[in-house]
C-alpha cells in the first residue's frame, strides 16, 4: 500500500508508493506485515525506519502506537541511530494485552532547517532581517499548535525577541535557541508534509509469554514407599519445594491413559513386563484418550486439587499436548481416517530417525482436517476449564503449520491468556514459522550451544530481529536430552548451564533431577538417560540430597530470586556481549531502565580460568572512563569494575559472577578486582 501524507494536494493527484517524505523498511515487521510483531505488557522494544528527503532540509520522525480500540497514544520521537545513515529509531513500550498497531510518521522539520541556516547567516551578517523574520513566522506557526499556555507563551516570547530590532541580531537569535524553547519544540515540533507508513500489527500478550521459570516433573514418580506409583494427591506434596526454588510454571508430561499394545519397557526395550508403567506419550486406552486422566494418577477431582494447590503457591500448570495415539486409543476405531494405513491395512507407527516409537501412531491430517481441528480445540478447552492456561505442544513440526495456526487462533480468539510452547527441535524455517503463526514460546538449540562462539552467535540471533516473533524457552535438560557437556562435566557443568539458561533467556527451565546433577547416559555417545523416567518410575530422596549437599537447588533458588529482583533479566532484546581474552570465559550484560546485570561465566567445568573482561562501558550506561561498584548477587561480594577487569572463576566454587551494576552512592563492601 502507498504511504500517506498530509498536505494540500488535490484529489486529482495520484498517491505515490514512497510518499512525500520517504518512510521505508519499518521494523519490526513479520511476514511483511501479514503477521503481528510480538511484545508483552510493559515490554520495551525498538521501532526503526529509513527516513530521508530531497536536498538538505531537515526531517524528523516519530512512532505512533494505537491501542486495541484504535486510539492513538502520545507519539514517541525518533532519533537518527547513527549519523548519516538515515536510519531512525525509538524505543516504545507495550501497554495492555490485545492487538495494537504502530506507524512511523516522517515530516519536514522547518525549524531545525531554519536554525541551521540562521547559525551560519546571522554571524556572517547575511540577510539578517529576512532570516530573523522567517524564524519568527515559523515560531508563530509552532505556537499555534501548542496546547499549554506556558509553553505557548515561551514560543511567543521568542517570536517577540526575533522581531525586536532594538536588540543585536545575535541576541535576537539566541533568545530563540534557549533550552526552554528547545524543550517546548521537542514536545510540540512544527511538522510539515507529515507522511505516515502503513500500520503494522503488534500483538501484546501477558508477561508469562516472555518470562518465567519452568519445572518439569512426572507426578507418577512422586509416590510413597508403600504405594510407589504417585498420584496427583501425592505429587501435590512436591509443589511447595518447587515453589520454594522460585519456579513459576510446573510442566507435566501427558497425564492420560497409556496404551498396552507394544508398550515399551525399561530403557526403551520392546518387551514390557506386567510391572512396566509405559510411556506417557503413548496416549490412549480403553479407559479413555486425551480428555481422560490415567486411573493410576487419580481422578479429575484429584487433578483439580493439584491445580488448586499449585495456584495457592503462585504456580501455573503447563500440560503436555501430544497429538498422537497409542494403538489402543479410542480414535483408532472411531476415526480410522485420522491415521496412515499401509497397503496391508495396518497403521504405521511413529518414527523420528534414528528413534522408533512402536507404541505410538502418528496422525494423518489431510483426510479430515476440520474434524481434527474441532476435536483438538475441544480437548484443549476441556483442560482450560480445569485451570490449565499453558500447553507444551509435543513435536508440532510434524503436523501441518496451517493446522496449528487455525487451532491457536480459535483458542486465543476467546482466551488470549492461553500460552502455547512449541517443542520443535528442527530446521530454523519451521521453528520461525511456528512462532510467527501463533506459538507464544519455542524450544531452542540452547542445549547444543556450549562454546563461547556458539552461545554468542546464537543469542545475538535470538535477541535481534527474531525477538519480535520468537520467544525462547531455555530448558537446561529434558527427559529426552542429556547432553555430553552434562554427562562429562559433573556438578560444575550443571551449575554453568543453569547460570547461562537463567540469565540469557527470560524463560528457562529444568527437568526434575537436574538439581541432583543426574548425568548417567544410556550408553556412551547417547543423549538418552540410563533408566529414563519416560519408561519407569524414578523416586528421588530430596531430603537426603539436601542433607548431604548433593543438590544444586540452593543455586537454582538464588538464580530465580535474582531474576525476580532484576527486570533486566526478564527481557530478551537488550543483550550485549563483552570481549574476554579467554575462549573459556564469556561475558554479557542486560539492561532494563536503570537496572543493569553483568554476567561472567567460566564455560570450562573442569579447570579454573583466569581472564580479563573488557567491558563496553556505554552498553552499561556508563562513559568509557568510568568505574563503578558491582555486586555479585551469587556471593554478596562487591567489586569495583572499570573498562578492564581481572576475573578468576573456579568450577565448583565460583562458576560465574552475576553482578548488578550499582550507582556510586552504594557503599563498596568488597575488595577491588580492577586492573
UniProtKB/Swiss-Prot annotation:
Gene3D superfamilies: Glycosidases, Golgi alpha-mannosidase II, Immunoglobulins, Phosphotransferase system, lactose/cellobiose-type IIA subunit. It holds the Pfam family GLGE_C. One of its GO terms (biological process) is alpha-glucan biosynthetic process. Disulfide bonds: none annotated. SUPFAM superfamilies: (Trans)glycosidases (SSF51445), Glycosyl hydrolase domain (SSF51011). The active site is at 394 (nucleophile), 423 (proton donor). It comes from the Bacteria. GO terms for molecular function: alpha-amylase activity; hexosyltransferase activity. Optimum temperature is 30 degrees Celsius with maltohexaose as acceptor substrate. Optimum pH is 7.0 with maltohexaose as acceptor substrate. Alpha-maltose 1-phosphate binds at residues 264, 324, 359, 395, 534-535. The record marks 480 as: Transition state stabilizer. Keywords: Carbohydrate metabolism, Glycosyltransferase, Transferase. Its EC number is 2.4.99.16. The keyword Coiled coil does not apply. Is competitively inhibited by alpha-, beta- and gamma-cyclodextrins (cyclic maltooligosaccharides), unlike GlgE from M.tuberculosis. Maltosyltransferase that uses maltose 1-phosphate (M1P) as the sugar donor to elongate linear or branched alpha-(1->4)-glucans. Maltooligosaccharides with a degree of polymerization (DP) superior or equal to 4 are efficient acceptors, with DP6 being optimal in the GlgE-catalyzed polymerization with M1P. Is specific for the alpha-anomer of M1P as substrate, since the beta-anomer of M1P gives no activity. Alpha-D-glucose 1-phosphate cannot serve as a donor substrate, but alpha-maltosyl fluoride is an efficient donor in vitro. Homodimer. Belongs to the glycosyl hydrolase 13 family. GlgE subfamily. This is Alpha-1,4-glucan:maltose-1-phosphate maltosyltransferase 1.
Amino acid at each position: 500500500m502507498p504511504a500517506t501524507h498530509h498536505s494540500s494536494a488535490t484529489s486529482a493527484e495520484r498517491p505515490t508508493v514512497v510518499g512525500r517524505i520517504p518512510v521505508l523498511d519499518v521494523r519490526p515487521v513479520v511476514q511483511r506485515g501479514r503477521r503481528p510483531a510480538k511484545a508483552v505488557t510493559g515490554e520495551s522494544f525498538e521501532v526503526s525506519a529509513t527516513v530521508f528527503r530531497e536536498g538538505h532540509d531537515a526531517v524528523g520522525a516519530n512512532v505512533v502506537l494505537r491501542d486495541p480500540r484504535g486510539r492513538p497514544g502520545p507519539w514517541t520521537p525518533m532519533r537518527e541511530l547513527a549519523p548519516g545513515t538515515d536510519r531512525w529509531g525509538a524505543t516504545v513500550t507495550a501497554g495492555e494485552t490485545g492487538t495494537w498497531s504502530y506507524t512511523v510518521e516522517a515530516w519536514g522539520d522547518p525549524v531545525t532547517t531554519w536554525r541551521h541556516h540562521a547559525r551560519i547567516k546571522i554571524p556572517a551578517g547575511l540577510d539578517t532581517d529576512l532570516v530573523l523574520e522567517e524564524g519568527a513566522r515559523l515560531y508563530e506557526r509552532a505556537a499555534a499548535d501548542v496546547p499549554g499556555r506556558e509553553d505557548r507563551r515561551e514560543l511567543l516570547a521568542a517570536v517577540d525577541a526575533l522581531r525586536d530590532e532594538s536588540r543585536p541580531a545575535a541576541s535576537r537569535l539566541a533568545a530563540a535557541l534557549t533550552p526552554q524553547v528547545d524543550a517546548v519544540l521537542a514536545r510540540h515540533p512544527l511538522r510539515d508534509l507529515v507522511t505516515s507508513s502503513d500500520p503494522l500489527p503488534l500483538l501484546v500478550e501477558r508477561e508469562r509469554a516472555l518470562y518465567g521459570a519452568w519445572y518439569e516433573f512426572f507426578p507418577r514418580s512422586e509416590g510413597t514407599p508403600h504405594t510407589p506409583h504417585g498420584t496427583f494427591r501425592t505429587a501435590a506434596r512436591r509443589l511447595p519445594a518447587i515453589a520454594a526454588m522460585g519456579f513459576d510454571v510446573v510442566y507435566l508430561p501427558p497425564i492420560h491413559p497409556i496404551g498396552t499394545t507394544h508398550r515399551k519397557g525399561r530403557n526403551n526395550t520392546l518387551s514390557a513386563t506386567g510391572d512396566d508403567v509405559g510411556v506417557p506419550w503413548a496416549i490412549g486406552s480403553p479407559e479413555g484418550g486425551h480428555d481422560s486422566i490415567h486411573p493410576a494418577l487419580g481422578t479429575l477431582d484429584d487433578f483439580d486439587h493439584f491445580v488448586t494447590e499449585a495456584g495457592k503457591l503462585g504456580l501455573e500448570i503447563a500440560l503436555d499436548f501430544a497429538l498422537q495415539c497409542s494403538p489402543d486409543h479410542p480414535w483408532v476405531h472411531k476415526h480410522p481416517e485420522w491415521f496412515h494405513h499401509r497397503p496391508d491395512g495396518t497403521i504405521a507407527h511413529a518414527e523420528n530417525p534414528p528413534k522408533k516409537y512402536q507404541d505410538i501412531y502418528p496422525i494423518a491430517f489431510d483426510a479430515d482436517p476440520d474434524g481434527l481441528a474441532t476435536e483438538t480445540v475441544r480437548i484443549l478447552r476441556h483442560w482450560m476449564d480445569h485451570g490449565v492456561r499453558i500447553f507444551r505442544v509435543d513435536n508440532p513440526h510434524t503436523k501441518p503449520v496451517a493446522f496449528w495456526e487455525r487451532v491457536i487462533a480459535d483458542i486465543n480468539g476467546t482466551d488470549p491468556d492461553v500460552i502455547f510452547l512449541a517443542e520443535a527441535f528442527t530446521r530454523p524455517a519451521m521453528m520461525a514459522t511456528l512462532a510467527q503463526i501463533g506459538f507464544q514460546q519455542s524450544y531452542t538449540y540452547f542445549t547444543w550451544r556450549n562454546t563461547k562462539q556458539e552461545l554468542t552467535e546464537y543469542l545475538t540471533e535470538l535477541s535481534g530481529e527474531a525477538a519480535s516473533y520468537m520467544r525462547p524457552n531455555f530448558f537446561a535438560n529434558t527427559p529426552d536430552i542429556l547432553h555430553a557437556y552434562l554427562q562429562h562435566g559433573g556438578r560444575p557443568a550443571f551449575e554453568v548451564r543453569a547460570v547461562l539458561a537463567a540469565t540469557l533467556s527470560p524463560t528457562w527451565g529444568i527437568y526434575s533431577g537436574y538439581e541432583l546433577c543426574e548425568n548417567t547416559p544410556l550408553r556412551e555417545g547417547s543423549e538418552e538417560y540410563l533408566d529414563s523416567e519416560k519408561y519407569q518410575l524414578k523416586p528421588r530422596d530430596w531430603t537426603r540430597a539436601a542433607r548431604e549437599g548433593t543438590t544444586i537447588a540452593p543455586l537454582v533458588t538464588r538464580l530465580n530470586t535474582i531474576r525476580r529482583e532484576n527486570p533486566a533479566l526478564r527481557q530478551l532484546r537488550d543483550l550485549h556481549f563483552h570481549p574476554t581474552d579467554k575462549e573459556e570465559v564469556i561475558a554479557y550484560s542486560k539492561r532494563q531502565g536503570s537496572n543493569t546485570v553483568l554476567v561472567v561465566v567460566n564455560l570450562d567445568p573442569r579447570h579454573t580460568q583466569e581472564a580479563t573482561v573488557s567491558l563496553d562501558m556505554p552498553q552499561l550506561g556508563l562513559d568509557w572512563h568510568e568505574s563503578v561498584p558491582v555486586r555479585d548477587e551469587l556471593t554478596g561480594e562487591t567489586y569495583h569494575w572499570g573498562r578492564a577487569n581481572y576475573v578468576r572463576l573456579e568450577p565448583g566454587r565460583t562458576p560465574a559472577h552475576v553482578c548488578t551494576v550499582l550507582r556510586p552512592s552504594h557503599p563498596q563492601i568488597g575488595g577491588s578486582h580492577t586492573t
